[in-house]
Amino acid sequence: MNNKILIVSANYYREISRNLELGASNTLKENGFEYEVINVPGCFEIPYLIKKNINNYNGFISLGCIIKGDTYHFEVIANETTRKIMDLSVDFNIPIGFGVLTCYNLEQAIIRSDINQKNKGQEAALACIQLLK
């Protein structure tokens, strides 16, 4: 494998995820990395797809958006998704750039996914690249 990265991106809040994908893919291209993108329904499914492909890539980038609602669902999805992604990275000794937004409102998500502002997809890609060096 020649530094091939898998971007796993959640379709929930698709416009946000699309911008995160753009930030990540541009960064990977600029740094000479090959990559593929697989979309999953939501953030909770990201760890499954990473585990399923753990032996096929040099690193992963997890992208998605979780926005707080009126129930405990936000905490469950945010905490369990984050924990399992970290577990996979440590247990399999493989870099996983974390670009799953956990926001209190849509405005925060828009800012953090804006390609011209704080694009967290770009930051997740840079983290993965740095860990591969």
Language-model features, listed with the residues they occupy:
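Active-site rim loops that border cofactor/substrate pockets in soluble metabolic enzymes
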Residues: S25-N56
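Glycine-rich phosphate-binding loop
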Residues: Y48-I85
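A charged, well-structured terminal subsegment
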Residues: K118-K133
